[in-house]
Each structure stands twice: as C-alpha cells, then as structure tokens.
UniProtKB/Swiss-Prot annotation:
Site (Enhances dephosphorylation of CheY-P): Q147
Self-association and partners: Homodimer.
Gene: cheZ
Keywords: Chemotaxis, Cytoplasm, Flagellar rotation, Hydrolase, Protein phosphatase
One annotated Gene Ontology cellular component of this protein: cytoplasm
InterPro entries linked: Chemotax_Pase_CheZ (IPR007439), CheZ_family_phosphatases (IPR050992)
Compartments in which it is found: Cytoplasm
Stated name of the protein: Protein phosphatase CheZ
Record GO terms (molecular function): phosphoprotein phosphatase activity
Domain of life where this protein originates: Bacteria
C-alpha cells in the first residue's frame, strides 16, 4: 500500500512538473513569436508581441486584401464587358462591309467608330493594367500569413507531441502501480465534454478574479508556481 501511495505521489509530482514545463514552453513560444524582418509588414508586426493578436492581425489583413481585390475586380469588369460588346458590334459591321453591304457614308461612319474604339481600348487597357497591378500588390499579405500559420502549426505540433508524452508517462506510472481506469466511462465523459458548449472568450476579463487577462498575468502565475 505504501509503495502504491509513493508511486501515486511520484506520478502527481511528475505530471505537475511536466504540465508546468509544457505551459512555460507554450507561453514562451507565444510571447517570442518572431517574424522574418524582411517581410513587407515586419515593422508593423514588431509592435505586436502576442501571437494571438498577430493571428488576428493576419485575419484583418486578409479581409482587407479580399475586399480590395473584389473592389478592383468590380471596377475592371465593366471595362472588359464594354470592350467585348464594342468589338462584337464592330466585327458585325466589318463583316457587312466585307460583303459590300455598306455604302460610302456607312463606311465613313464605321471608320469613325473604329477610331473611337481604338482610342477607348487604349485608355481601358491602361486602366485595367493599373488595376491588375493593384490586385497583385494587395496579395503581399500572403508572405506574412504563411510565416504566421507555419509558426502556429509548428507550435501546435510541439504541444501535441508534449501532451502525448505526458499521457504516455501517466499511463506508465499507472501500469506500474496497478491502477486501472474505466475507459468506457472516460470516453463517455469526454464525449459529453465535447458536446457541451464552452465558456468562450472572456468578456470584461479585467473585472473577473478567476481568469488571467494577459500574457503578463500568465508569466506571473507560472513564475509563482516555480516554472
């Protein structure tokens, strides 16, 4: 009995240390979230220290780029449609001319329309070129997005790996101690927890005493626990 109690205490201490270590590593990774200094938005991003805020910033940039792109496409579509309509009309008139169905006055009118079409086409082409260039520039957020998402993916992978090690360690201690768990009940409880609605983001967290309100509070809590 004493051996089982000692093993249980050792397990609890080990789990406590591993959870604290994992939390400290995760906290440090979130705070020290470095971005490539050559990124177009590196200077602006350097003012944002928290990874969560940086992800929110990326979402905001993505939304702005999407809106900008859609606006430019909406501005470009009428120009393209006009060029298509004018070219089809002129093509029909040119076919009539080739069949000698247009007299001299009609040909002079057609020549005038062709000249106007060429001038208008040049102007529209210049405007379309400018708008396409703006669309291209609006996509520069992708470099930053890729960096942040890759860092977050790496962070999540590391956390998952550490959690797997933690569960494995707990299982080994339980096996040596001869402790058996009701896995059916545990799976049922896990399913209930997954279906239950979470508390969600903390609203007015600064007015509550049971939650931490920022990375500084997390750091203070970990330090007070010896991690």
């Amino acid at each position: 009995m004493q051996l089982i109690q000692e093993l249980s205490q050792a397990r609890d201490r080990g789990l406590y240390q591993e959870v604290g270590k994992l939390t400290r590593e995760l906290h440090n990774a979130i705070v020290d979230f470095q971005i490539d200094p050559h990124s177009p938005h590196a200077q602006e991003m350097s003012q944002i220290a928290d990874a969560t805020d940086r992800l929110s910033y990326v979402v905001e940039m993505t939304e702005k780029a999407a809106n900008r792109t859609m606006d430019l496409v909406e501005q470009s579509a009428p120009l393209v449609n006009q060029l298509g309509d004018d070219s089809r009309e002129l093509h029909q008139e040119w076919q009539r001319f080739m069949r000698r169905e247009i007299d001299a006055d009609g040909f002079r009118e057609l020549a005038k329309r062709i000249e106007q079409f060429l001038v208008r086409s040049g102007e529209n082409a210049g405007q379309l070129s400018s708008q396409l260039n703006d669309i291209l520039l609006a996509q520069d957020y992708q470099d930053l997005t890729g960096q942040v998402i890759k860092r977050v993916t790496k962070l999540v992978t590391e956390v998952e790996s550490n959690l797997v090690k933690l569960v494995w360690m707990a299982g080994q201690v339980d096996r040596y101690a001869g402790i058996e768990h009701d896995h059916v009940s545990m799976r049922h409880q896990a399913a209930l927890e997954r279906s239950a609605k979470g508390e969600g983001p903390q609203v007015a967290a600064e007015k509550r005493e049971d939650v931490v309100s920022g990375q500084d509070d997390v750091d203070d809590l970990l330090s007070s626990l010896g991690f």
